[in-house]
């Protein structure tokens, strides 16, 4: 059971996960338990644009931007940011800034 950050259908949760190779982000409605939108740095359209690696800060920013665009297309304007226990720095911060740059409010 989630204790700290809880999303709803009006304001879903934007969760970030970092692996050793990729950065993942998804928007989740915790009341229904479904993922509404997702993006990761392993997607071909993101990998094509990258010059660093799939785990770089530039990749994380592109993941945030892609997620922001997809969320806006689905009518999601505001989210609750769940940094997943990571400090708000580096790749996690870049995902947040990328999503904010596309108009997502949190």
Predicted features and spans:
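Ribosome large-subunit tunnel/peptidyl-transferase-proximal elements
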Residues: 1-106
